Amino acid sequence: MIKARLSLFSLLLFSASSFADSHQVYGTYLVQEKNSHVQITDCGDGSPCGVVVWLDPTKLQPGITPDTARSKAGKPVLGLTMLEGFSRQRDDWRDGTIYHPGKDKTYASKLKRLPNGNLEVKGCISIFCQTQIWTEVVQNTE
């Protein structure tokens, strides 16, 4: 009986701790402006990289499609790497960069998975940071 309770307690503890793991940032997210999806995967070295995988056509300028949308620097936005260079810290990912295609600017960045599954994304210039909450996109499997 005690063994069964300990096993159940261990299972619940493991499940809860893995769900709330702030390092599990991989997935697809709707950015705060609700105009694009960024897919975060492993860069190949264990750190996260984020690539633009969808643009909302209703939020683009007239005559521009997701396939023809360009950054201020003239790069195609679809497929653009906008998050990279992160290192794992105790509670989050830090020392990375986030690229803003509309401004052609790159900022210092931090990433952290929130307990509700959303992603906290910070972009910083020196000590001044702006925080956004990106919503996890649930893929329809039907």
Question: Which role does the model predict for each range below?
Answer:
Residues 43, 101, 112, 124-126:
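Short polar/acidic secondary-structure junctions
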Residues 1-8:
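Bacterial N-terminal signal peptides that target proteins for export
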Residues 140-142:
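Short, solvent-exposed mixed-charge patches
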Residues 26, 32-102, 106-107, 135:
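Central antiparallel beta-sheet cores of small beta-barrel/beta-sandwich binding domains
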Residues 109-113, 117-119:
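C-terminal terminal-subdomain/extension
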